[in-house]
Amino acid sequence: MREIVLDTETTGLDPLTGHRLVEVGAIELFNHLPTGKSYHTFINPDRDVPREAEAVHGLSSEFLKDKPRFEKIADEFLAFIGDSMLVIHNASFDVGFLNAELGFIKKPPLLYERVTDTLMLAKKRHPMGPNSLDALCKRYGIDNSKRAKHGALLDSELLADVYLELIGGRQIALTLP
């Protein structure tokens, strides 16, 4: 079974107030094993990146100004995810932004039925929390020392490890070339 673990970075917290995507990162799992295939892009949001958002992910308006707009990367992104199940931490946030961007270019939305929300899984498994990505990495002994700032691709890689722990643990001896 093919699954895509993905994360986004944005200019703010709500696409309904004009905030936009600035980065998408995704990695492919097949039968719960990383295949080594990934998708990553930065996106020009056509607006300024507020200082608060830049402090989270480190992506400035200046850095993003020559990056492609979402409509230029949408087909490639949709081809990468295909009809696979999506694994996302706090899925309503990321799917909300992705669906807003897809709506701007008249593409159909991603359906929540194809999404596994690892935040919901974590809350069921660890109801006393905390259940942030950093907290889950610490709980499961996953090295997140490279994560000085949020980054969509690195966060997807960390989330894949967390997801595998949440569903029953990693099989250390099994890896794909």
Regions of interest found by a model, annotated:
Residues 151-166:
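Acidic, divalent-metal-coordinating active-site segment for phosphoryl/phosphodiester hydrolysis
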Residues 165-177:
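Acidic two-metal-ion nuclease catalytic site recognized across multiple nuclease folds
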Residues 1-113, 123-126, 135-149:
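Conserved non-catalytic scaffold segment of RNase H-like nuclease domains
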